[in-house]
Curated annotation (Swiss-Prot):
It comes from the Bacteria. GO terms for cellular component: cytoplasm. The active site is at C31, D38. Substrate binds at V53, E54, L55, Y72, E73. Keywords: Cytoplasm, NADP, Oxidoreductase, Queuosine biosynthesis. Its main location: cytoplasm. GO terms for biological process: queuosine biosynthetic process; tRNA modification. The lineage of its organism: Bacteria, Pseudomonadati, Chlorobiota, Chlorobiia, Chlorobiales. Catalyzes the NADPH-dependent reduction of 7-cyano-7-deazaguanine (preQ0) to 7-aminomethyl-7-deazaguanine (preQ1). SUPFAM superfamilies: Tetrahydrobiopterin biosynthesis enzymes-like. This is NADPH-dependent 7-cyano-7-deazaguanine reductase. PANTHER family: NADPH-DEPENDENT 7-CYANO-7-DEAZAGUANINE REDUCTASE. It catalyses: 7-aminomethyl-7-carbaguanine + 2 NADP(+) = 7-cyano-7-deazaguanine + 2 NADPH + 3 H(+). InterPro entries: GTP-CH-I_C/QueF (IPR043133), NADPH_dep_7-cyano-7-deazaG_red (IPR050084), QueF (IPR029500), QueF_type1 (IPR016856).
Length: 116
Protein backbone atom coordinates (compact mmCIF):
# COMPACT_ATOMS: atom_id res chain seq x y z
CA UNK A 1 0.00 0.00 0.00
CA UNK A 2 2.64 2.42 -1.11
CA UNK A 3 1.52 5.96 -1.84
CA UNK A 4 4.38 6.19 -4.37
CA UNK A 5 2.50 3.79 -6.69
CA UNK A 6 -0.29 6.33 -7.21
CA UNK A 7 -0.02 8.83 -10.04
CA UNK A 8 -2.10 11.84 -10.94
CA UNK A 9 -2.63 14.16 -13.86
CA UNK A 10 -3.65 17.79 -14.24
CA UNK A 11 -7.34 18.61 -13.99
CA UNK A 12 -8.14 20.72 -17.06
CA UNK A 13 -11.30 22.09 -15.37
CA UNK A 14 -10.17 23.11 -11.87
CA UNK A 15 -12.71 25.94 -11.64
CA UNK A 16 -15.66 23.62 -12.20
CA UNK A 17 -17.19 21.40 -9.54
CA UNK A 18 -17.78 17.93 -10.94
CA UNK A 19 -17.73 14.47 -9.41
CA UNK A 20 -15.56 11.52 -10.36
CA UNK A 21 -16.71 8.10 -9.16
CA UNK A 22 -14.43 5.09 -9.32
CA UNK A 23 -15.74 1.62 -8.42
CA UNK A 24 -13.66 -1.52 -7.97
CA UNK A 25 -16.07 -4.46 -7.49
CA UNK A 26 -13.20 -6.96 -7.14
CA UNK A 27 -11.24 -5.52 -4.21
CA UNK A 28 -9.46 -8.13 -2.09
CA UNK A 29 -7.45 -8.17 1.11
CA UNK A 30 -6.70 -10.62 3.92
CA UNK A 31 -8.28 -10.79 7.37
CA UNK A 32 -5.46 -10.11 9.87
CA UNK A 33 -7.06 -12.46 12.42
CA UNK A 34 -7.97 -15.54 10.34
CA UNK A 35 -5.69 -15.11 7.32
CA UNK A 36 -8.70 -15.73 5.07
CA UNK A 37 -9.34 -13.57 2.01
CA UNK A 38 -11.83 -10.72 2.21
CA UNK A 39 -13.79 -9.64 -0.86
CA UNK A 40 -15.46 -6.31 -1.32
CA UNK A 41 -16.35 -3.35 -3.46
CA UNK A 42 -14.53 -0.07 -2.98
CA UNK A 43 -16.01 3.18 -4.25
CA UNK A 44 -14.09 6.45 -4.40
CA UNK A 45 -16.16 9.55 -5.14
CA UNK A 46 -14.40 12.91 -5.29
CA UNK A 47 -14.62 16.49 -6.50
CA UNK A 48 -11.17 17.23 -7.93
CA UNK A 49 -9.15 20.35 -7.37
CA UNK A 50 -5.93 20.61 -9.40
CA UNK A 51 -5.23 16.86 -9.85
CA UNK A 52 -7.08 13.67 -10.85
CA UNK A 53 -5.99 10.11 -10.07
CA UNK A 54 -4.59 8.03 -12.93
CA UNK A 55 -6.58 4.78 -13.04
CA UNK A 56 -3.86 2.29 -14.00
CA UNK A 57 -1.78 3.39 -11.02
CA UNK A 58 -4.86 3.09 -8.80
CA UNK A 59 -5.36 -0.48 -10.00
CA UNK A 60 -1.78 -1.37 -9.00
CA UNK A 61 -2.23 0.43 -5.68
CA UNK A 62 -5.31 -1.73 -5.00
CA UNK A 63 -3.28 -4.87 -5.86
CA UNK A 64 -0.99 -4.02 -2.92
CA UNK A 65 -3.84 -4.90 -0.54
CA UNK A 66 -4.34 -8.43 -1.92
CA UNK A 67 -1.91 -10.11 0.46
CA UNK A 68 -2.04 -7.56 3.26
CA UNK A 69 -3.54 -8.48 6.61
CA UNK A 70 -5.61 -5.37 7.33
CA UNK A 71 -9.00 -4.59 8.86
CA UNK A 72 -11.84 -3.13 6.75
CA UNK A 73 -11.83 0.11 8.72
CA UNK A 74 -8.10 0.58 8.23
CA UNK A 75 -8.32 -0.04 4.49
CA UNK A 76 -11.06 2.55 4.09
CA UNK A 77 -9.20 5.21 6.07
CA UNK A 78 -5.82 4.42 4.44
CA UNK A 79 -7.27 4.83 0.94
CA UNK A 80 -8.84 8.15 1.94
CA UNK A 81 -5.61 9.44 3.50
CA UNK A 82 -3.54 8.43 0.47
CA UNK A 83 -5.98 9.97 -2.00
CA UNK A 84 -6.10 13.23 -0.03
CA UNK A 85 -2.28 13.33 0.08
CA UNK A 86 -2.05 12.70 -3.66
CA UNK A 87 -4.89 14.86 -4.97
CA UNK A 88 -5.78 17.48 -2.36
CA UNK A 89 -9.40 17.25 -3.62
CA UNK A 90 -12.21 19.63 -2.75
CA UNK A 91 -14.00 16.66 -1.21
CA UNK A 92 -13.75 12.90 -1.28
CA UNK A 93 -15.60 9.87 0.06
CA UNK A 94 -14.38 6.29 0.24
CA UNK A 95 -16.93 3.53 0.79
CA UNK A 96 -16.03 -0.14 1.22
CA UNK A 97 -18.75 -2.80 1.09
CA UNK A 98 -17.66 -6.25 2.23
CA UNK A 99 -19.08 -9.64 1.25
CA UNK A 100 -20.71 -11.70 3.98
CA UNK A 101 -18.46 -13.51 6.42
CA UNK A 102 -20.36 -15.71 8.87
CA UNK A 103 -23.61 -14.22 7.60
CA UNK A 104 -22.56 -10.64 8.43
CA UNK A 105 -21.77 -7.89 5.93
CA UNK A 106 -20.07 -4.60 6.70
CA UNK A 107 -19.95 -1.22 4.99
CA UNK A 108 -17.39 1.41 6.02
CA UNK A 109 -17.52 4.99 4.76
CA UNK A 110 -15.31 7.98 5.42
CA UNK A 111 -15.45 11.53 4.05
CA UNK A 112 -13.07 14.48 3.74
CA UNK A 113 -13.82 18.08 2.79
CA UNK A 114 -11.05 20.61 2.12
CA UNK A 115 -10.96 23.59 4.45
CA UNK A 116 -9.79 25.97 1.69
Amino acid sequence: MKLEILESFENKYPNRDYTIEIVNPEFTSVCPITGLPDFGTITIRYVPNQRCVELKSLKYYFFEFRNAGIFYENITNKVLDDMVALLEPRSISVITEWKARGGITETVSVHYTSQS
